A protein has these predicted regions:
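Short, Lys/Arg-enriched, disordered terminal segments
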Residues: 1-3, 248-251
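Generic detection of intrinsically disordered/low-complexity segments and helix-coil linkers/edges
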Residues: 4-6, 97
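S-adenosyl-L-methionine-dependent methyltransferase catalytic module, highlighting the catalytic core
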Residues: 6-21, 25, 47, 51, ...
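Conserved SAM-binding loop
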Residues: 24-140, 241-247
Length: 251
């Protein structure tokens, strides 16, 4: 299969775990950055890593499970985001974590490890399901959950007991931003994977929520991060939220 993105042509034979639109958006964002060392974790099939390498980045791949990895001329390291990653301090200029943080038992540990192994001023590109778009907020109202809960039969028979396949930590953007800032990251940019045209029917509800935020007290705005959760990239965002951050001097 061939596809053109960021002025390069690449070929692959596997299926990306993250949405194609998420891969394409991250490639577009990273194409504007100076070339350097990048860690792709969890790398999954290695498709994104292959694209980044063809763009001129020095790529390292890491995942808790190597059985899905399908890029023969790239090496994969085994690492668990809930524990210490197998890299020295200050190893990477960039870190890409697509659809991984919500699968961890301890997302704070993962962010702390990212901070440790990245160089000062390094850029992080992190994606996670957008649990706070208006569509998912309505779903939560009726179901009481932001993410589907797998059955024990699925975990046992299909996932072979691997809980890391489930969304163990479905984090909304305010909490994820809070954790990242606690470990010295500064948020630079938010992106969505794609627009969802059917959300136009939910615009009246979005306007009502924004009106509530406008007249809320300053304290309420701050503690609930209302200015952040009502911005277009989140409340009108797609299925996936893409966060670009930078490691500061702290930590």
């Amino acid at each position: 299969m061939k596809r053109n993105s960021a002025n390069i042509e690449w070929t692959y034979g596997a299926i990306p775990f993250a949405r194609n639109e998420t891969h394409d958006k991250v490639i577009e964002m990273m194409d504007k950055e100076p070339r350097g060392s990048v860690l792709d974790v969890p790398t999954g099939t290695g498709i994104l890593a292959e694209r980044l390498r063809k763009m001129g980045f020095e790529v390292s791949c890491c995942d808790i499970n190597s059985s899905f990895f399908s890029v023969p001329d790239l090496k994969i390291d085994i690492g668990d985001l809930n524990q210490s990653l197998p890299y020295p301090d200050h190893s990477f200029d960039y870190l890409v974590c697509l659809e991984g943080i919500e699968h961890t038992e301890n997302p704070s540990n993962a962010i702390r490890e990212f901070q440790r192994i990245m160089k000062k001023g390094g850029k992080i590109f992190l994606s996670t399901p957008n649990f706070l778009n208006i569509e998912r907020r309505i779903r939560f109202l009726f179901t009481g959950t932001f993410s589907k809960i797998p059955s024990h039969e699925v975990i046992k028979n299909i996932w072979k007991g691997d809980l890391a396949m489930a969304h163990l930590s479905p984090l909304g953007y305010p909490l994820l931003k809070f954790i990242m800032e606690c470990y010295g990251f500064r948020i630079l940019r938010l992106e969505k994977d794609r627009a969802k045209p059917k959300m136009v029917w939910l615009l009246p509800l979005v306007w009502f929520i924004r009106l509530y935020g406008r007249f809320a007290s300053q304290k309420r705005k701050e503690v609930y991060r209302l200015d952040e959760t009502t911005r277009d990239e989140i409340i009108l965002g797609g299925n996936t939220l893409i966060i670009m951050g930078e490691k500061g001097s702290e930590g």
